[in-house]
């Protein structure tokens, strides 16, 4: 996946009026993945996330717009995550002093409420590629376990 195009400037948007969706260049480059995600019900937002070696995203809580009766649930699915002995690549949820680690691996998925504080760590030798997707769910259907 190292030959995936990374943003080098403005991204073009394509409107599909039949589906009532807006697509980007990546949807034309990866039509099978686009169809799979669309057929799976992904409608809010989806993208491919690349985190380079030794990089990450510090602790934060996303303020995605959501209606009063909904929650945005974010998913992360490992596409190309080459973990070697002693390396770490994970999504941390909670707080810096009291958090949970969800290891990011090939074909493994994790879902969480995007307003919960979280961070991402990539201590690998290689970039890690993931699908990031958002689902909008009615609050009345979401249980806190």
Question: What residue spans do the PLM features occupy?
Answer:
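Ligand-binding loop in jelly-roll beta-barrel domains
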Residues: 116-130
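Catalytic core of non-heme Fe(II) oxygenases with the double-stranded beta-helix
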Residues: 30-111, 128-130
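Short catalytic/ligand-binding loop motif for oxyanion handling, primarily in non-cytosolic enzymes
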Residues: 57, 119-121, 139-142
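Intrinsic disorder/low-complexity detector
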Residues: 5, 18-20, 27-28, 62-66, ...
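Non-heme Fe(II)/2-oxoglutarate
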Residues: 1-40
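Structured loops at beta-to-helix junctions and adjacent beta-edge loops in soluble globular domains
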Residues: 1, 16, 49-51, 78-80, ...
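Short peripheral tails and domain-boundary helices/loops at the edges of structured domains
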Residues: 129-145
């Amino acid at each position: 996946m190292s030959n995936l195009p990374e943003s080098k400037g403005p991204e073009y948007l394509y409107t599909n009026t039949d589906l009532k969706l807006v697509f980007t260049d990546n949807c034309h480059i990866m039509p099978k993945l686009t169809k799979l995600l669309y057929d799976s019900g992904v409608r809010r937002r989806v993208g491919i996330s690349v985190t380079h070696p030794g990089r990450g995203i510090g602790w934060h809580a996303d303020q995605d717009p959501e209606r009063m009766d909904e929650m945005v649930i974010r998913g992360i699915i490992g596409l190309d995550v080459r973990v070697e002995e002693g390396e770490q690549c994970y999504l941390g949820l909670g707080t810096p002093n009291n958090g949970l680690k969800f290891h990011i691996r090939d074909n493994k998925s994790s879902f969480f409420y995007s307003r919960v504080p979280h961070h991402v760590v990539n201590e690998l030798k290689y970039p890690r590629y993931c699908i990031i997707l958002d689902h909008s769910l009615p609050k009345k259907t979401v249980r806190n376990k």
